[in-house]
Amino acid sequence: MYRDPEAASPGAPTRDVLLVSAIITVSLSVTIVLCGLCHWCQRKLGKRYKNSLETVGTPDSGRGRGEKKAIKLPAGGKAVNTAPVPGQTPHDESDRRTETRSSVSDLVNSLTSEMLMLSPGSEEDEAHEGCSRENLGRIQFSVGYNFQESTLTVKVMKAQELPAKDFSGTSDPFVKIYLLPDKKHKLETKVKRKNLNPHWNETFLFEGFPYEKVVQRVLYLQVLDYDRFSRNDPIGEVSIPLNKVDLTQMQTFWKDLKPCSDGSGSRGELLLSLCYNPSANSIIVNIIKARNLKAMDIGGTSDPYVKVWLMYKDKRVEKKKTVTKKRNLNPIFNESFAFDIPTEKLRETTIIITVMDKDKLSRNDVIGKIYLSWKSGPGEVKHWKDMIARPRQPVAQWHQLKA
């Protein structure tokens, strides 16, 4: 007898129904797993994007055209740049990325407990103020107040012995001027290209600024290295509470630059050794270990590895890198890399060492860098010279990682 399949018992599912149910179950499981993974990635990338947005910058119009520039201040006055030197190449504001707000914010908080008496000095008779761990150079400037015109005058003159921030062994310095606690408005000098002893001689006027409000402000100067393609690199800073300065006449200061309070904390240190063999025309770089590295991951740790670049006349020649140490802020590497460097090319050679945080799901993060050459910072130059003075001997030294 013919029996219609659709008339079969309702309690007995067919094979096709079971197959479709299995496919739907597997699809739902895969979808849930992918959604969870995407949510985790979004949280991690969102945190970095949020940090990148916490910046401040005031675009300046008309830079380099010779006209006066004014900014309306909360106190009711205005700031005017009256730089007398025309024809100098300005830095293009559209090419500059904004810097983090934390540098100025941290300084405002710290100044409440650091209102120290400051005395004016001259280039000839003022000694360096204390012994800093690293020489960041010094800056000369003057400040005074005109009571008849209610105008505060700040003149940025020059700087000396600035550290090299570029891998070419030089810097492109400029100065930002703030009257704290106002952090939104700033004035800037021109950029001095490839100059570690720049002369600016630029004058800035804060007009219509009552004296009783001036003495409540803190003059803050920040020296930075201009970078057209990335964030400007802070070199150092100086701050003066104006209630501690005799403003009845122009006072000239020579002040040592102090490390900028970037709010990011220490990036850690790296121990490495250099061994120069003049007969073999080679340098062996041994990456030994690091300590107190900055945590870059959400879990409060990092997956560090080290890249070593050999540069010659600002051009990349060769790259080496270590293995990655998982979840370790005090990794031990003990990896050596040999680079062929003829003696006659040694002065134009730079070794760039970058400690990175490995990330599987996004771009690897830079923890910190070290530039080794004849023209780097004081600590780096010392290591380089010690290497030359002691051929065929490994010379080890700790280096502070920098941004």
Curated annotation (Swiss-Prot):
Effect of disrupting the coding gene: No visible phenotype. Mice were born at the expected Mendelian ratio and do not show gross abnormalities and/or obvious neurological defects. Mice have a normal life span and are fertile, although reproductive capacity is declining faster with age. Embryonic fibroblasts from Syt7 deficient mice are less susceptible to Trypanosoma cruzi invasion, and display impaired lysosomal exocytosis and resealing after wounding.
InterPro entries for the chain: C2_dom, C2_domain_sf, C2A_Synaptotagmin-7, C2B_Synaptotagmin-7, Synaptotagmin
Pfam family, one: C2
Membrane topology (Cytoplasmic): 38-403
Chain intervals for the UniProt region annotation (Disordered): 53-103
Cofactor(s) the protein requires to work: Ca(2+)
Residues that bind Ca(2+) 4: D297, D303, D357, D359, D365
Keywords noted in UniProt: Calcium, Calmodulin-binding, Cell membrane, Cell projection, Cytoplasmic vesicle, Exocytosis, Lipoprotein, Lysosome, Membrane, Metal-binding, Methylation, Palmitate, Peroxisome, Phosphoprotein, Repeat, Synapse, Transmembrane, Transmembrane helix
Biological role: Ca(2+) sensor involved in Ca(2+)-dependent exocytosis of secretory and synaptic vesicles through Ca(2+) and phospholipid binding to the C2 domain. Ca(2+) induces binding of the C2-domains to phospholipid membranes and to assembled SNARE-complexes; both actions contribute to triggering exocytosis. SYT7 binds Ca(2+) with high affinity and slow kinetics compared to other synaptotagmins. Involved in Ca(2+)-triggered lysosomal exocytosis, a major component of the plasma membrane repair.
Protein name: Synaptotagmin-7
Lineage: Eukaryota, Metazoa, Chordata, Craniata, Vertebrata
Gene this protein is translated from: Syt7
